[in-house]
């Protein structure tokens, strides 16, 4: 390594299921909202962004993520990413799987708007639907096909099955512009 970089950064490879804890923290880092999701598929399949995820509830993960953000007096929206029992990163912003907040009927967005206007917001545990799958149509189709090509038939077929049951991440009620823009960019501008 010395030949390529005199001071390489060496990191441990972490295995296990990927999951995220989305949090909204108000003034004085008060917890105002939380939502957990697990990665179902990703692309590239060797490690990349979620193409399909599912909502679930894990109080321990929420507590760990909250204590971390609270320790540096964070305020706002953030997603803490876990792999197995390890925290990988913190995204202190709106993140890629943010549409899960709508798909799982989480009040995080409403709480954000209320808090921004100075309103009182109280956190309630498990205030969203669990077991809700959400996907990014094109990316998830490519992921499912990649699993099949790699010989991971069960995962690939499950992905094709989710085509009919998972909620579309970029489908907004009454507004097809978002989905049309996504399809146009994905199909013609890459």
Specify the residue positions occupied by each region the protein language model found.
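ATP-dependent carboxylate/phosphate-activation module, predominantly the ATP-grasp catalytic core
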Residues: 5, 12-73, 91-116
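Short N-terminal signal/transit or membrane-insertion segments
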Residues: 17-23, 78, 146-154
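A short glycine-rich, hydrophobically flanked beta-strand micro-motif that places a catalytic Asp/Glu
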Residues: 75-84
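Secondary-structure boundary/capping residues
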Residues: 77, 99, 121-122
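Catalytic activation segment of kinase domains across protein kinase-like and atypical kinase folds
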Residues: 85-89
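Peripheral (often C-terminal) accessory segments that flank ATP-dependent C-N-forming ligase machineries
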Residues: 114-190
